[in-house]
């Protein structure tokens, strides 16, 4: 590894220490708990929406979350390793065939829904079939 890769790996390890980052991707509904500082007080605010894309890699990776608030579409970009992110929770997995879901910006109502990904079930074992 060259020097830049070593420095990035050190930073990545330092920033991700103690953080649990679940695996999620475009189409997944996530709740991002964000630390908000108002004056001297600090609180945690939940931001729930659909992940419409991830970009970058390593310490520069970020993801975009879209939600509808009071009839208006709101998108927010979060750096994955930001110290302002308290936690990330995946609520449901979406079945999509694109890496970037920017087409959701033009859709409203039922057409903007994303089908939930079905859980893979283990194969049924038929008694005596293997013999």
From Swiss-Prot:
Pfam families reported in the protein's UniProt record: Ribosomal_L19
Presence of the UniProt keyword Ribosomal protein in the record: yes
GO molecular function, one term: structural constituent of ribosome
Superkingdom of origin: Bacteria
InterPro entries in alphabetical order: Ribosomal_bL19, Ribosomal_bL19_CS, Ribosomal_bL19_sf, Translation_prot_SH3-like_sf
Record GO biological process: translation
Keywords: Ribonucleoprotein, Ribosomal protein
GO cellular component, one term: cytosolic large ribosomal subunit
NCBIfam families in the record: rplS_bact (TIGR01024)
Annotated function: This protein is located at the 30S-50S ribosomal subunit interface and may play a role in the structure and function of the aminoacyl-tRNA binding site.
Similarity-based family: Belongs to the bacterial ribosomal protein bL19 family.
Full protein name: Large ribosomal subunit protein bL19
Organism in which the protein naturally occurs: Rhodopseudomonas palustris (strain BisB18)
Top-level taxonomy: Bacteria, Pseudomonadati, Pseudomonadota, Alphaproteobacteria, Hyphomicrobiales
Originating gene: rplS
């Amino acid at each position: 590894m060259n020097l830049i890769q070593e420095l990035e790996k050190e930073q990545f390890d330092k920033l991700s220490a103690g953080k649990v980052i679940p695996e999620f991707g475009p189409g997944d509904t996530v709740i991002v708990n964000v630390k908000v500082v108002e004056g001297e007080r600090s609180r945690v605010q939940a931001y729930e929406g659909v992940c419409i894309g991830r970009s970058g890699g390593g310490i520069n990776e970020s993801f975009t979350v879209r939600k509808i608030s009071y009839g208006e579409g709101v998108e927010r970009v979060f750096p994955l390793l930001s110290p302002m992110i308290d936690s990330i929770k995946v609520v449901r997995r979406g079945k999509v065939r694109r890496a970037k879901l920017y087409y959701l910006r033009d859709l409203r109502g039922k057409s903007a829904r994303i089908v939930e990904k079905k859980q893979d079930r283990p194969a049924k074992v038929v008694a005596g079939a293997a013999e």
